[in-house]
Amino acid sequence: MKKLLSIFLMAFSLNAFAQTNLADVQLKDLNNQPVTLSQYKGKPVYVKMWASWCPICLAGLAEIDDLSAEKDRNFEVITIVSPDHKGEKDTADFIEWYKGLEYKNITVLLDEKGEIIDKARVRGYPFNLFLDSDLNLKKTVPGHLGAEQIRVFAEK
């Protein structure tokens, strides 16, 4: 009975995202310019949700930087931070802090309204989102994922 319930809950949670499209979520880049995820339409997208106070998130940034630099990927790699949400710095403080880091290949977008947190039901950090080429949320995975794990999930 427990197995049946577990299978039902997993199937239900996957279907909960079936209609969640993130194309029109309003974000900003590190220059405070407006961005929507729609510019990534056409390729699957991996999104790492993270926070500046999260040591596990910070430990994984070098690997995300390397993955972001790869030219032969068949999926996009972006990261999203939510200023003023879940204990994160405000926008200006985060941008100033991030500019002091050495990661030059990572695309960092800011979700100031917390829309992604709400739509994807982000419970903690790091939190990974996998979007299809139409930017529908197809899978979420909490916790750290290495580059090889990201490739496996993104290419499914």
UniProtKB/Swiss-Prot annotation:
Domain Thioredoxin: 19-156
Top-level division of the source organism's lineage: Bacteria
Cross-referenced Gene3D superfamilies: Glutaredoxin (3.40.30.10)
Any one GO MF annotation of this record: antioxidant activity
Pfam families the UniProt entry points to: AhpC-TSA
InterPro entries linked: AhpC/TSA (IPR000866), Thioredoxin-like_sf (IPR036249), Thioredoxin_domain (IPR013766), Thioredoxin_ResA/DsbE_sf (IPR050553)
Signal peptide: 1-18
Keywords, alphabetical: Disulfide bond, Redox-active center, Signal
Keyword Lipoprotein: no
Disulfide topology: C54-C57
Family: Belongs to the thioredoxin family.
Protein name, as recorded: Uncharacterized protein HI_1453
Annotated organism of origin: Haemophilus influenzae (strain ATCC 51907 / DSM 11121 / KW20 / Rd)
Taxonomic placement: Bacteria, Pseudomonadati, Pseudomonadota, Gammaproteobacteria, Pasteurellales
